[in-house]
Amino acid sequence: NRKGKAMPNPQDIFQLAQQTATQVTASPENWRRFLYTAAHNYHTTYLNQLLIHAQRPDATACATMKYWNEQAHRKVMYGSKSIIILQRYQGVPTAKRVFSMTDTVLTGDKAAAPWEVTDAIRPLLMQVNSVGSLMDRETEQGVSLSDRANRVLATSIEDSALNWSHPEDQRFILQEVAAQSTLYMICIRLG
């Protein structure tokens, strides 16, 4: 709200995400352009990836000004334009401003890279290496990630463009699109 700029209405922001979802799924080229944005903002939700893509398709590693200024050894440059995303606060969707890493400058000797392996996550990565897939591990609620993924797949198929295909093929097609999209994003990240 600085400089008297009011935050946009969460309903308007959600509508922008819906419009963007329609646009990015309209053609393979539009989807590839969206995947570029998603690959550089993989830490956030699909909804927020859509919002970032709609406002700044070239944005990378978007985070709040507080994160950049206080934790990442970076400062947001004066005059940088924020990107509006949605987050839930006590169950209510609220607008939140984030900035691309390209809108920041280094303030110290060492920058905290958003994708680097830190001591905090190293044990989890080692556990994944020794145990294999996390898909069969249970969450705090006693539900495996595989079960959760299956529920997400089922709800993603409902009311989607996959209605043209045979019901037995819908899940396979969606999984294939997700797998190919993930591989494409990995290739983008690897250069």
PLM ranges: what are they?
Residues 1-191:
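N-terminal accessory/interface modules of nucleic-acid-binding and processing proteins
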